[in-house]
């Protein structure tokens, strides 16, 4: 995490890290590790606490006081009061600052126009909201009037520089000069497949791969010269009809996998490789048909939270080694696989998951490659071998 933050600071003048859930909500909901606060600690990032103050009066003071009491590193440098009227803000601001010795940087009044609806896996994506640009412009106008942007910039400028020790990688990376032709990994990226850790894609490039994006929704074939396939998470269930109608791409992907092309499919990408996706009403939509099984919307949360995946056989990792990831899905499959063992933090609870063979990795978990770079290394090497003609025929894994 420190390494990624340091690398980003070389490119961007300012970084904004958006927290998720509550500030102190970490592993299992009981540990600091993995929380937004923990992230701020390891990256030495000052915190601006945004408090939902709707319907609150003076009670907002002990609420803020509680967060400050937990702030052992004194990282909280200011507070913004969300969904509060201007008239009450002018009353409560001096009281907060006098009692808690914390700067109140401003407020944002509630406006229906600024609300963004959520759904089962979170917020709607920017490209799906017709008036998103106007919403952002209105929000910026409001914030300029009611929040001290200058003070926020000053707080950001006070952040400490992250010093990173140079560590020799245990896994030797492939450089472009070592390859006559670099393997090309085709990455699905459109409205239906949009959940990717950018760090994962950067790591694939570091290990010698080129990346080419394509759309299972709109394109008819994979990028020319593809020797690996990455199908990330997203919302294929929302575009099931369109994916079904793109018969050419479904056949293209099935043929690619059957030819032995290495494939990594996470969550939404895993759903797409099934024979069919069934919606909440049980209606089936035909998918790529690589995996002879159907997946169904269960109408309830099936898995959620951080996990570590332990390798049972040496395909994408060495036996017994682990890689970190997370799960968040309402769908379930007739064939979830059992080639890896998922281990939950805190409780240590385990369960089998993932379908994994020599050149196939697919399942519900979203992986974070930097937690074990060997995964990216293996993936790129498999793509290189495919490019060299190693995988000449498809073996039925299922």
Residue ranges and their predicted role:
Residues 40, 179-180, 193-205, 210, ...:
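C-terminal and late-domain segments of enzyme folds
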Residues 14-27:
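Switch II (G3) loop of P-loop NTPases
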Residues 30-37, 65, 245-249:
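Charged helix-capping and loop-helix junction motifs
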Residues 183-247, 251-256:
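Phosphate-binding active sites in nucleotide-utilizing proteins
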Residues 1-8, 12:
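Single conserved hydrophobic/aromatic residue that forms the stacking wall/gate
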Residues 32-53:
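Inter-motif core of Ras-like GTPase G domains
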Residues 57-173:
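Internal gly/pro-rich beta-alpha loop/helix module
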Residues 236-315:
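Cysteine-nucleophile active-site neighborhood
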């Amino acid at each position: 995490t420190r390494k990624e933050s340091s690398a980003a600071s070389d490119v961007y003048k300012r970084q904004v890290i958006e927290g998720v859930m509550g500030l102190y909500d970490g592993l299992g909901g009981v540990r600091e590790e993995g929380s937004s606060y923990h992230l701020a600690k390891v990256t030495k990032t000052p915190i601006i606490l945004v408090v939902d103050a709707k319907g609150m009066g003076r009670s907002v003071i002990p609420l803020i006081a509680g967060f400050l009491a937990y702030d052992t590193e004194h990282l909280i440098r200011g507070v913004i009061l969300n969904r509060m009227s201007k008239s009450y803000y002018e009353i409560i601001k001096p009281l907060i600052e006098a009692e808690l010795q914390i700067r109140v940087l401003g407020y944002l009044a509630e406006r229906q126009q600024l609300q963004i609806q959520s759904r089962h896996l979170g917020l709607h994506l920017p490209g799906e909201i017709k008036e998103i640009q106007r919403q952002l412009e209105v929000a910026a106008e409001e914030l300029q009037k009611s929040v001290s942007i200058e003070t926020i910039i000053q707080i950001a400028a006070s952040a400490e520089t992250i010093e990173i020790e140079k560590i020799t990688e245990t896994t030797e990376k492939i450089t472009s000069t070592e390859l006559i032709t670099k393997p090309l990994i085709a990455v699905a990226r459109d409205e239906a497949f949009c959940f990717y850790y950018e760090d994962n894609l950067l790591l694939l490039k570091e290990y010698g791969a080129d990346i080419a994006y394509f759309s299972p929704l709109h394109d008819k074939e994979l990028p020319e010269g593809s020797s690996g396939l990455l199908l990330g998470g997203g919302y294929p269930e929302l575009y099931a009809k369109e994916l079904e109608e793109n018969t050419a791409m479904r056949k293209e992907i099935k043929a690619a996998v059957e030819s032995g092309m290495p494939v990594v499919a996470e969550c939404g990408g895993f759903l797409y490789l099934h024979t069919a996706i069934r919606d909440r009403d049980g209606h089936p939509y035909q998918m790529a048909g690589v995996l002879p099984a159907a997946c169904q919307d269960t109408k309830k949360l099936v898995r959620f939270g951080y996990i570590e995946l332990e390798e049972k056989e040496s395909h994408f990792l060495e036996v017994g080694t682990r890689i970190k990831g997370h799960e968040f899905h309402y769908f379930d499959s007739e064939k979830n696989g059992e080639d890896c063992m998922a281990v939950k933090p805190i409780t240590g609870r385990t369960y089998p998951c993932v379908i994994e063979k020599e050149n196939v990795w697919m399942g519900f978990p979203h992986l974070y490659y930097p937690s074990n770079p060997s995964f990216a290394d293996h993936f790129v090497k498999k793509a290189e071998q495919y490019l060299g003609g190693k995988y000449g025929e498809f073996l039925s894994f299922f």
